[in-house]
Amino acid sequence: RHIAFVDRVGDTFRWKGENVATTEVERAFAKVPGVAEAAVYGVPVPRADGRAGMAAIVPAAGQRVDVRAAAAVLARELPAYAVPRFLRLVGSYETTATFKVRKVALKQQGFDPGAVSDPLYVLVDRARGYEKLTPRLYARICAGELRLP
């Protein structure tokens, strides 16, 4: 007999051969000014290895999240592979009876600006930080013309 540790589905994802713990990334968002909550999950990216990190962020009441400043904080707090490639600004989350964020719908919606009405941002260049995810950028990412760092 033996005992094996089995991780909860959704608590980790793989990006470019590395395991990313969503809780570690969510804790890093606590240091980003203007962020009340963050739910982190992996989303498939065409022609990429694994799932890219995406964070659905609830801004603190009456505050704006500076997405460029967020990139700098996350780069300081996390290994490069763990920094989410996509951000989604949301008003609130759908939760379970035990107050856990329902990430399934967020994962299914992915990062398509044509399907998601919330503001979306992408990390194309670490030095510049996050920028607005436009339909043109989305098409270039999906076609493999634009590779995420």
Regions found by a protein language model. Name each.
Residues L78-K100, D118-L148:
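AMP-binding/adenylate-forming catalytic domain of the ANL superfamily
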Residues Q109-Y121:
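A short, polar/charged loop-to-alpha-helix boundary motif
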Residues A48, A61, A69, G114, ...:
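Polar/charged alpha-helical tracts
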Residues R1-A82, S92-V101, A105:
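AMP-binding/adenylate-forming catalytic core of the ANL superfamily
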